[in-house]
Design a protein with these regions (language model features):
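N-terminal accessory interaction module
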Residues: 1-62, 152-173
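Amphipathic alpha-helical segments that form the core helices of the histone-fold
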Residues: 100-114
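Extended, non-catalytic structural segments that build the interaction scaffolds
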Residues: 61-73
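Acidic, proline/glycine-rich low-complexity IDRs
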Residues: 115-180
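Short, surface-exposed acidic
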Residues: 89-104
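Short acidic alpha-helix initiation/capping motifs at coil-to-helix transition points
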Residues: 75-83
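Soluble, non-transmembrane alpha-helical interaction regions
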Residues: 74-75, 93-95, 112-124
Length: 180
């Protein structure tokens, strides 16, 4: 079986998110964190977590990327149990049985993302459309036979149907100088 773990290729997650997940934590999508939030009003690091974060189950921190890894039945059971504990302690689940059922669904969804080779990286892009959260996932495959451990060492990206957010740094710099 395969599950997803957080991966940190550089230090950017520590700047992008209020709390960055630790590398190699078991992860889930984390969209449930925003169920009661007014996502249209999120700003800054909270908005970044909503738009592009996977939730590290142990730290409840966020990771831009997750890696598909091999897992055992015991790993999966421990992940479900830890997420259930976190749902009770931090997200208002009424009891461990209810939390376990919700955790099972979250882990099953994470598992459904793993229909790619081991070591494939996955990124998420979340939006809020027509009153619902929408998630789109992109996969990054390593070049050649090397494992993906360095930033920018990827060749193939799947799931590029969504338009990318673009920032024109040159125009921003010119506008800043003109306005100064």
């Amino acid at each position: 079986m395969k599950l997803i773990r957080t991966i940190r290729l550089d230090a950017s997650d520590t700047f992008v998110f209020a709390r960055a997940a630790e590398p190699t934590e078991w992860a889930v999508s984390g969209a449930f964190v925003f169920w009661n939030a007014d996502v249209e009003k999120l700003e800054g690091k909270a908005r970044s977590a909503f738009r592009s974060g996977f939730l590290g189950v142990e730290s409840l921190g966020w990771s831009t990327l997750v890696q598909i890894v091999e897992a055992t039945d015991a790993d999966r059971a421990a992940l479900v149990e830890r997420l259930a504990q976190q749902l009770v302690a931090h997200f208002g689940a009424p009891d461990i049985a209810s939390a376990r059922a919700a955790a099972e669904e979250e882990v099953a969804f994470a598992e459904s993302l793993c229909n790619h080779p081991t070591d494939t990286l996955i990124a998420v892009h979340r939006t809020f459309e027509d009153g619902a959260v929408r998630e789109a996932f992109r996969t990054l495959h390593p070049r050649g036979d090397r494992k993906p451990m360095r930033a920018f060492s990827f060749l193939e990206v799947e799931g590029e149907e969504e338009p990318a957010d673009e920032v024109n740094l040159v125009a921003l710099a010119k506008n800043k100088r003109a306005g100064s």
